[in-house]
């Protein structure tokens, strides 16, 4: 048997939602791929149609390159995030610089992702959504992030959160509110709202968040995607618990 073609259910669900929502509410998410000339438009469609495992399979088969996928994600972020405001810090250069060092046998092969701005990524600003931490740059990544990168994920930036993750809406004085991609007048939920909005808008196929009392699940339900609270001891232990 050949490799299974992984096309995520959530993409089908979101496309169905798009047909029932007004164009003004969807703007600027709706039509971004068709508005981009080929080959960028083609890569944008692949970014939307495949989940992380499916994109990794395309990269492994040399149908596309990891750099092309990462650049397509960067293009989409540049096009949409002024309105959605999902990211607090971009790490595009860091991701592109690390791509050549991604081992060829990793699970994710350089697939792009994002990390909630509540977790240490070495050399990248971590603010906790607070003006108090705008100058905080950790020297070392937590074990969870190291495991993500060993698995071949390319981190493109940090995602917005309410200050110190203390709320079910993503809004703070430092960066402002994160809008729901399906209706920009509504909030993405919280506290992992930046990550949920980024996935729903098609920036990346998956993003990291934290969840103690619904912080992944609430924004996921607001944005129409899957959000998980991992069981204890089923992931790398440490701060990301």
Positions of PLM-derived features:
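N-terminal secretory signal peptides and thylakoid transit peptides that target proteins
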Residues: 2-21
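Generic low-polarity alpha-helical segments
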Residues: 10-13, 72, 95, 236, ...
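Gly/Ser-rich catalytic/binding loops embedded in alpha/beta enzyme cores
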Residues: 17, 21-22, 38-213
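Boundary at the C-terminal end of the N-terminal hydrophobic targeting segment
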Residues: 33-37
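Fold-level recognition of mixed alpha/beta catalytic cores in primary-metabolism enzymes, strongest
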Residues: 168, 196-241
């Amino acid at each position: 048997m050949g490799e299974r073609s992984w096309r995520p259910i959530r993409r089908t669900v979101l496309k169905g939602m798009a047909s029932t929502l007004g164009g003004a509410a969807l703007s600027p998410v709706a039509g971004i791929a068709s508005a981009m000339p080929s080959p960028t438009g083609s890569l944008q469609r692949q970014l939307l149609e495949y989940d992380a495992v499916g994109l990794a399979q395309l990269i492994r088969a040399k149908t596309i390159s990891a750099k092309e996928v990462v650049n397509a994600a960067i293009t989409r972020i540049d096009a949409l995030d002024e309105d959605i405001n999902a990211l607090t810090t971009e790490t595009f250069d860091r991701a592109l610089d690390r791509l050549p060092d991604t081992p060829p046998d990793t699970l994710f092969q350089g697939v792009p992702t994002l990390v909630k701005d509540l977790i240490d990524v070495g050399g990248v600003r971590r603010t906790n959504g607070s003006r108090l931490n705008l100058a905080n740059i950790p020297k070392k990544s937590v074990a969870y992030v190291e495991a993500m990168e060993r698995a071949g994920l390319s981190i493109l930036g940090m995602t917005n959160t309410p200050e110190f993750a203390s709320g079910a809406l993503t809004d703070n004085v430092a960066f402002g509110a994160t809008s729901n991609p399906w209706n920009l007048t509504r909030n993405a939920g919280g506290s992992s709202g930046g990550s949920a909005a980024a996935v729903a808008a098609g920036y990346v196929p998956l993003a990291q968040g934290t969840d103690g009392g619904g912080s992944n699940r609430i924004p996921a339900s607001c944005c129409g995607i899957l959000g998980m609270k991992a069981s204890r001891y089923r992931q790398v232990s440490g701060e990301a618990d």
